[in-house]
């Protein structure tokens, strides 16, 4: 008997099954199609077989870590939400997917990762509370820098020199995109009628994050909440496909009774790697900043350092 497919994704919060855009899209598509996945909702990407989230381990042991490729694999396994779409609807799907990535994705990244208030009070707060030590000290900041670089690439050569002008232009285009989605949806349950398709999985992931998070700076969120059919659309999908998971609170850092469970593969190995990486990062920072300098001294200090590392590892068990 073949092993079950396993999906590793970011855990949930803000009333959603996942706080990550890509993880939420893949989870939603899987629910739409009824794909039999063993889902691991985690807050440490190093516990993923690819080191990134989301990631799918297929029944043959192959690891896929790009959302579109994960969905393509599910289609090959005959879990295809677009099976009944016409050629015209397939073309519309591609057009709207391109629109989402070009007009809505940059502003979503800006809203959660670049806007100072939102990042400090919402995004960094959730990841810092959910991630294990010591990842919660440095990984949110690294993720923010990566999103800033991606946003610069998305803006491309048409980027205005004035940052305020760029932000105004991005948000204007995103509002127009939301309005267009609202007009296209109309009074339908889903974008192509009574059954969900892959487009619905991606649109929902964009809209639900924007709708559910309590953002102190929510210009685009306010525009979305004025489009009542899109808000009802998100609520319908949440209640129908995530009736229990959507109500979960952000996961606290817990110490499970049995650290070697099936839900946490390679836990011991990754705990040790996490602690060592954190200690190395803090030691490197101390050396580079001049807080600590290397001098010739007796080696009596080494046992104390080793004891500290063991104590931190014990706390992670």
Swiss-Prot record:
Involved in transport of proteins into the mitochondrion. Essential for embryonic development. Keywords: Isopeptide bond, Membrane, Mitochondrion, Mitochondrion outer membrane, Protein transport, Transmembrane, Transmembrane helix, Transport, Ubl conjugation. It is found in: Mitochondrion outer membrane. There is a cross-link at residues 38, 41, 78 (Glycyl lysine isopeptide (Lys-Gly) (interchain with G-Cter in ubiquitin)). One of its GO terms (cellular component) is SAM complex. Pfam families: GST_C_6 (PF17171), Tom37 (PF10568). The keyword Transport applies. GO terms for biological process: mitochondrion organization; protein transport. Its main location: mitochondrion. This is Metaxin-1. The keyword Glycoprotein does not apply. Interacts with MTX2/metaxin-2. Associates with the mitochondrial contact site and cristae organizing system (MICOS) complex, composed of at least MICOS10/MIC10, CHCHD3/MIC19, CHCHD6/MIC25, APOOL/MIC27, IMMT/MIC60, APOO/MIC23/MIC26 and QIL1/MIC13. This complex was also known under the names MINOS or MitOS complex. The MICOS complex associates with mitochondrial outer membrane proteins SAMM50, MTX1 and MTX2 (together described as components of the mitochondrial outer membrane sorting assembly machinery (SAM) complex) and DNAJC11, mitochondrial inner membrane protein TMEM11 and with HSPA9. InterPro entries: Glutathione-S-Trfase_C_sf (IPR036282), Glutathione_S-Trfase (IPR040079), Metaxin1/3 (IPR017410), Metaxin_GST (IPR033468), Mito_Protein_Transport_Metaxin (IPR050931), Sam37/metaxin_N (IPR019564). The chain crosses the membrane at residues 164-184. PANTHER family: METAXIN RELATED (PTHR12289), METAXIN-1 (PTHR12289:SF34). Ubiquitinated by PRKN during mitophagy, leading to its degradation and enhancement of mitophagy. Deubiquitinated by USP30. Belongs to the metaxin family.
């Amino acid at each position: 008997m073949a092993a079950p497919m396993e999906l590793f994704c970011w855990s949930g919060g803000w009333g959603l099954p996942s706080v990550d855009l890509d993880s939420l899209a893949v989870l939603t598509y899987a629910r739409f199609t009824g794909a039999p996945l063993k889902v691991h909702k985690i807050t440490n990407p190093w516990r993923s077989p690819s080191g990134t989230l989301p990631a799918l381990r297929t029944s043959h042991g192959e690891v896929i870590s790009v959302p579109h490729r994960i969905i393509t694999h599910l289609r090959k396994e005959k879990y295809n939400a677009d099976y009944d779409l016409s050629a015209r609807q397939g073309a519309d799907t591609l057009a709207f997917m391109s629109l989402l990535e070009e007009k809505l994705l940059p502003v979503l990244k800006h809203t959660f990762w670049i806007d100072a208030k939102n990042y400090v009070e919402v995004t960094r707060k959730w990841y810092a509370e959910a991630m294990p030590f010591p990842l919660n000290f440095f990984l949110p900041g690294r993720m923010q820098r990566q999103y800033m670089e991606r946003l610069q690439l998305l803006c491309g050569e048409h980027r205005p020199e004035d940052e305020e002008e760029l932000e105004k232009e991005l948000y204007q285009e995103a509002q127009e995109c939301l309005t267009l989605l609202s007009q296209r949806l109309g009074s339908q349950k889903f974008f192509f009628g009574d059954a969900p398709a892959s487009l619905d999985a991606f649109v929902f992931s964009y809209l639900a994050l924007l709708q559910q998070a309590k953002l102190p700076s929510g210009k685009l969120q306010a525009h979305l909440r004025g489009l009542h059919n899109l808000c009802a659309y998100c609520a319908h999908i949440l209640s129908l496909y995530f009736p229990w998971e959507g109500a979960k609170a952000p996961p606290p850092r817990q110490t499970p009774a049995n650290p070697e469970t099936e839900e946490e593969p390679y836990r011991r190995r990754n705990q040790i790697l996490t602690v060592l990486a954190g200690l190395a990062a803090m030691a490197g920072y101390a050396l580079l900043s001049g807080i600590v300098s290397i001098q010739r001294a007796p080696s009596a200090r080494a046992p104390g350092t080793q004891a500290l590392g063991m104590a931190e590892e014990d706390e992670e068990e």
